[in-house]
Regions:
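Catalytic-domain carbohydrate-binding cleft regions of carbohydrate-active enzymes
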Residues: 1-189, 237-242
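Accessory, solvent-exposed terminal regions and/or long lumenal/extracellular loops of proteins
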Residues: 189-278
Length: 278
């Protein structure tokens, strides 16, 4: 299954299992921070939905505290739509190849002893490494309410597995693998890294899932310093015709020496760089 953003039983209730800590729900800054971090994390799960009990979970109910939490969740929501071509293609490969959407680092980096021990980072599809923020930074929950933290730490430690380089999704900064770094983690975002050698299909943020990869208006972001390729799965986005072969697989190939992206017919494809800066 998947996470239910918002959680169940967030308030104190009448039964032994109904023992939440956030009676004021969206009026409690500590709950706003918690919900925001959950929302940012769940952006990188197969199913993304605000579900739970005891309080409203629609984004427009989180505009308090100067709107910083609302803006952070809105940013995550837009990113989810921007990544739909990648997410949809990944889901297609789960059906077609028995691939997995989410994997622990040990699956892809079995020879990296440090990666075997990581339990708070994971791979989402073949290209993205997600690093959720699981510690409070801005508000600490106490018996008297939410205590605002002075000079909060806005970083978290991230391990970059060895065997490839990594790009910071937000800044395009390039890092060699096999090292720990302090990654920026302000309330606006969680650390997110792209594996070197990736071609990431994206689109403009949409109003609904009806405006997805089938629109054909894709942007390919190249994160590479050598030749690489990406196989994009598409179908009509509705019904079960794909089970009878009504789908398309298109391979996009990056030529590092020519700095050109081509499709499987040799046609040049418009792309943008996930530029490296050391």
């Amino acid at each position: 299954w998947t996470a239910d953003i918002g959680a169940f039983f967030v308030k104190r209730g009448d039964y032994w299992y109904w023992d939440g800590e956030y009676d004021d729900t969206v009026e409690d800054p500590a709950y706003l921070e918690l919900y925001t971090r959950w929302y940012q994390w769940c952006c990188f799960l197969p199913i993304f939905r605000g579900h739970g009990t005891d309080c409203r979970r629609e984004l427009w109910n989180f505009k308090g505290a100067d709107g910083v939490f609302y803006q952070a969740m809105l940013r995550a929501n837009k990113l989810r739509y921007e990544l739909l071509p990648y997410i949809y293609s990944t889901a297609g490969k789960v059906w077609l190849y028995d691939a997995s959407m989410i994997r622990m680092l040990a699956f892809d980096f079995p020879k990296d002893a440090k990666a075997l021990e990581i339990t708070d980072q994971y791979l989402f599809g073949e290209s993205l490494m997600v690093c959720p923020v699981t510690e409070t930074m801005y508000y600490k929950k106490s018996a008297t309410g939410a205590e605002k933290q002075e000079n909060p730490s806005k970083v978290r430690n991230v391990y970059l597995p060895e065997g490839c380089g990594w790009y910071d999704f937000w800044t395009n900064t390039y890092y060699e693998g096999g090292q720990w770094i302090e990654a920026e983690a302000p309330i606006e975002r969680i650390p997110l890294f792209v594996k070197e050698g990736s071609i990431l299909p994206m689109q403009q943020s949409a109003n609904s899932t009806a405006e997805t990869v089938m629109s054909g208006n894709l942007t390919f972001v190249v994160y590479a310093q050598k030749d690489c390729s990406y196989e994009l799965y598409t179908d009509d986005g509705d019904g079960y015709a794909y089970e009878n072969g009504a789908y398309t697989l298109e391979t996009y190939m990056w030529n590092q020496s020519e700095q050109i992206l081509r499709d499987s017919k040799g046609r040049e494809v418009v792309f943008v760089y996930g530029k490296a800066s050391k």
